[in-house]
């Protein structure tokens, strides 16, 4: 797809007329609605219909092949053109493309690599703009602001979903109806069905990278999070889905749901790791595995809860001392919270091109989201200390507690009110991922009556039957 004077950067591409460029601008204004049917891809530098059909198998294989790590900027531009050419052919051909999918996981590989290249290009572009050290590359990027554009990538994913009518099929399955009745001409083909399905997972990932965590969770409304789901058949897709869902829950302060998501996939991985060794995605899964343990450590520090024995043992082994420091709270824990968050969070991207003329104005998206998260952590820094005092009393004077903590009474009152509000979390029960019921996240509750604090504590009994069953299974 040759946009914005790409001809100057790539002499072999055809020049575009002023009329086409004006039409492109109009397309991008409308793309936020994602209902234009990929019409802008008509301006893609692509093969003719006959030759493209003959070479489609090669294009499909190339689309699922990772780009070299040290690929040049021209190679990244060319890769974008190739993806646009491929998706244009699949979406805008006269009727469905009759093609046998190379493998059941091929569609995931295509969507995964497409989004990875988009993510890495955005981060690279932001890095060049902020450093201001390579004027030649900065000029190329400045002249091609729509290459790997956010709207283009989102438009591809939404178009694949709409073309395949995959959401309608999934909704029918949840109602116990025949999905084939809702598939339509395109959705009945495996090529479109699989691309559409994994585009939903792709949207979850992209919206999370852009920082819209609520919309990220909303995209999975029609997908059931269980082992029977289609994404569970592809280990990398299975892992990716739970990572981004769990992270989105964490960033929306639903720590209990985040822990549940992370724990589910980590237990699954611990039971299947011997089968994964030697696989193409083993290293990537191992890295994400460590990241999720770091995120669980953060969530448990912010939302103390009982973990699965397998997760608890692994967490103690990996982050024993660090977890203890996180749970102690206080200003000393802040650097550790930030370190773990930066090491485990997605590599966030900006939805718009950077300002190449004013490098100082460009903000690293990771820094931005880290600052937002750390503001939340600062609100809960003294919760462990406050809890340790409140657990000793049923009623306590505000002035007395302020004296123990060496803070002003009104500041303590503010902390208590914030903590009580934060302790009310939404917990998923059924339905969409955003749905749930509001519950108290702590086993310690309190109420303020002027300067008197009334404390109540509920202790959950140990489920000894479950403990015995798990350990008997290990012995026998």
Curated annotation (Swiss-Prot):
For this UniProt entry, the molecular function terms from Gene Ontology, in alphabetical order, are: translation initiation factor activity
Q: Does the keyword Protein biosynthesis apply?
A: yes
Q: Which residues form the PCI domain?
A: 257-452
The lineage's top-level taxon is: Eukaryota
The record's subcellular locations are:
Cytoplasm
Major localisation:
cytoplasm
Q: Has keyword Cytoplasm?
A: yes
Show the InterPro entries listed in the entry. eIF3l (IPR019382), PCI_dom (IPR000717)
Report the record's Gene Ontology biological process terms: formation of cytoplasmic translation initiation complex; translational initiation
Task: Alphabetically list the UniProt keywords.
Answer: Cytoplasm, Initiation factor, Protein biosynthesis
Spans through the membrane: none
What is a single cellular component term in the Gene Ontology annotation? eukaryotic 43S preinitiation complex
Q: Which residues form a coiled coil?
A: none
The subunit structure is: Component of the eukaryotic translation initiation factor 3 (eIF-3) complex.
Belongs to which family?
Belongs to the eIF-3 subunit L family.
Q: What does this protein do?
A: Component of the eukaryotic translation initiation factor 3 (eIF-3) complex, which is involved in protein synthesis of a specialized repertoire of mRNAs and, together with other initiation factors, stimulates binding of mRNA and methionyl-tRNAi to the 40S ribosome. The eIF-3 complex specifically targets and initiates translation of a subset of mRNAs involved in cell proliferation.
Supply the PANTHER family for this chain. EUKARYOTIC TRANSLATION INITIATION FACTOR 3, EUKARYOTIC TRANSLATION INITIATION FACTOR 3 SUBUNIT L
Instruction: Give the protein's recorded name.
Output: Eukaryotic translation initiation factor 3 subunit L
Q: Which organism is it from?
A: Emericella nidulans (strain FGSC A4 / ATCC 38163 / CBS 112.46 / NRRL 194 / M139) (Aspergillus nidulans)
């Amino acid at each position: 797809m040759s946009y914005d004077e790409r001809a100057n950067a790539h002499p072999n591409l055809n020049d575009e007329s002023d009329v086409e460029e004006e039409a492109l601008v109009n397309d991008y204004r409308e793309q936020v609605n994602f209902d234009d049917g990929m019409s802008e891809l008509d301006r893609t530098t692509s093969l003719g219909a006959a030759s493209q059909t003959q070479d489609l198998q090669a294009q499909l294989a190339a689309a699922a092949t990772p780009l070299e790590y040290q690929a040049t900027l021209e190679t990244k531009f060319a890769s974008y053109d190739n993806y646009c050419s491929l998706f244009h052919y699949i979406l805008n051909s006269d009727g469905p493309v009759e093609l046998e999918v190379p493998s059941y996981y091929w569609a995931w590989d295509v969507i995964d690599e497409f989004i990875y290249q988009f993510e890495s290009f955005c981060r690279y572009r932001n890095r060049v703009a902020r450093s201001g050290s390579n004027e030649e590359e900065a000029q190329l990027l400045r002249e091609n602001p729509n290459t790997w554009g956010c709207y283009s990538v989102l438009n591809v994913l939404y178009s694949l979903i709409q073309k395949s009518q995959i959401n309608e099929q999934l909704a029918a399955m949840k109602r116990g109806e025949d999905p084939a009745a809702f598939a339509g001409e395109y959705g009945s083909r495996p090529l479109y069905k699989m691309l559409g399905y994994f585009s939903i997972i792709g949207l979850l990932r992209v919206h999370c990278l852009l920082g819209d965590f609520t919309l990220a969770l909303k995209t999975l409304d029609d997908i059931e999070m269980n082992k029977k789901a289609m994404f569970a058949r592809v280990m990398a897709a299975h892992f990716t889905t739970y990572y981004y869902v769990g992270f989105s829950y964490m960033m929306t302060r639903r720590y209990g749901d985040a822990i549940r998501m992370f724990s589910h996939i980590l237990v699954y991985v611990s039971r299947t790791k011997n089968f994964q060794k030697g696989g193409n995605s083993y290293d990537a899964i191992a890295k994400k595995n460590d990241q999720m343990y770091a995120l669980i450590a953060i969530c448990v520090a912010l939302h103390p809860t009982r973990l699965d024995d397998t997760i608890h043992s692994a967490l103690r082994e990996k982050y024993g001392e660090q977890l203890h420091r996180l749970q102690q709270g206080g200003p000393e824990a802040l650097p550790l919270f930030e370190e773990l968050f930066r090491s485990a969070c997605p590599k966030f991207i900006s939805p718009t091109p950077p300002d190449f003329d004013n490098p100082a104005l460009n903000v690293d998206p990771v820094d931005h989201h880290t600052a937002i998260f750390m503001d939340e952590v600062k609100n809960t820094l003294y919760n462990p200390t406050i809890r340790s005092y409140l657990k000793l009393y049923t009623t306590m004077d505000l002035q007395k507690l302020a004296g123990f903590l060496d803070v002003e009474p009104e500041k303590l009152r503010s902390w208590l009110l914030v903590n009580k509000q934060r302790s009310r979390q939404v917990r998923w029960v059924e339905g969409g991922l955003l749905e749930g019921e509001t519950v108290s996240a702590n086993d310690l509750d309190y109420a303020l009556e002027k300067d008197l604090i009334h404390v109540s504590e509920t202790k959950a009994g140990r489920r000894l039957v479950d403990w015995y069953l798990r350990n008997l299974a290990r012995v026998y």
